């Protein structure tokens, strides 16, 4: 078997799964599989685009006040009152629960456990198991199947940036120290007690967020380690020209644990 071709296909499959799991696209696609939901929206004159967006946002947020949802859906209508009117229609259609005493909307539709786990693993770009493509313009990222921006956030421009540096750091071979992942416990700061002014509910949310991140990170690391004995991280600039590696679960610019589990594939003793 040609190992290089196998790794290439593995990398393409990882990228295809990532593209499929772009957050809003994937969540909306789950709702679009249910014909009953479309029938309800049509019956109550709820535009499908708005309805699916609304359901996806509610599934992700679980509960939210109307102001928050209006802000998230503002691209559908120029008039904020129109968005409120459509949300009221969704309440009448029983697509969401409204608790008048708390003034909050609560989702009626939970994502399945399998879908949620796949989203957790693949909604962010993963490390590459083959060398990244050479980037030749600001719209490339090094990934085989998808472009993007080499300038982070909403700061894209066509001006010259140092592509040579990006290509150089993109091709550094890295590996995971799986013994460290098992023997050293990952932790975030201030999870042992509530912050000043923090509610018990918010404290619990922070702990739950860490548990979810940590569990998913270990699964992603196992996936990458099984695919190849080395991996590559892609990089981009911020608007001030500082270099950041792309990676949510695996990132050598993270906390102490994130740094400790990543090593150079080709090591040498520093004199």
Per-range role (PLM):
Residues 1-271:
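Non-catalytic nucleic-acid-binding interfaces of large nucleic-acid enzymes and RNP effectors
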């Amino acid at each position: 078997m040609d190992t290089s071709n196998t790794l290439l296909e593995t990398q393409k499959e990882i990228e295809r799964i990532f593209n499929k799991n772009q957050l809003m696209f994937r969540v909306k696609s789950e709702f679009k599989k249910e014909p009953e939901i479309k029938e309800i929206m049509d019956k109550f004159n709820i535009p499908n685009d708005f309805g699916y967006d609304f359901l996806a946002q509610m599934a992700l947020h679980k509960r939210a006040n109307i102001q928050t949802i209006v802000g998230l859906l503002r691209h559908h209508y120029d008039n904020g009152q129109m968005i409120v009117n459509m949300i009221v229609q969704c309440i009448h259609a029983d697509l969401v629960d409204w608790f008048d005493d708390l003034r909050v909307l609560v989702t009626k539709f939970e994502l399945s456990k399998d879908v949620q786990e796949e989203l957790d693993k693949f909604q962010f770009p993963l490390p590459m198991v083959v060398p990244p493509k050479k980037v030749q313009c600001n719209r490339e990222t090094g990934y085989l199947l998808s472009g993007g921006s080499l300038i982070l956030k909403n700061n894209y421009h066509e001006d010259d940036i140092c592509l040579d540096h990006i290509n150089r750091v993109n091709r550094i071979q890295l590996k995971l120290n799986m013994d460290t992942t098992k023997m050293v416990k990952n932790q975030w700061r201030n999870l042992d007690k509530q912050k000043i002014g923090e509610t018990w509910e918010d404290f619990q949310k922070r702990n739950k967020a860490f548990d979810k991140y940590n569990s998913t990170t270990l699964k992603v690391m196992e996936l990458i380690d099984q695919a190849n004995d080395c991996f590559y991280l892609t990089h981009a600039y911020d608007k001030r020209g500082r270099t950041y590696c792309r990676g949510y679960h695996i990132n050598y610019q993270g906390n102490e644990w994130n740094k400790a589990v990543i090593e150079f594939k080709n090591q040498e003793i520093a004199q």
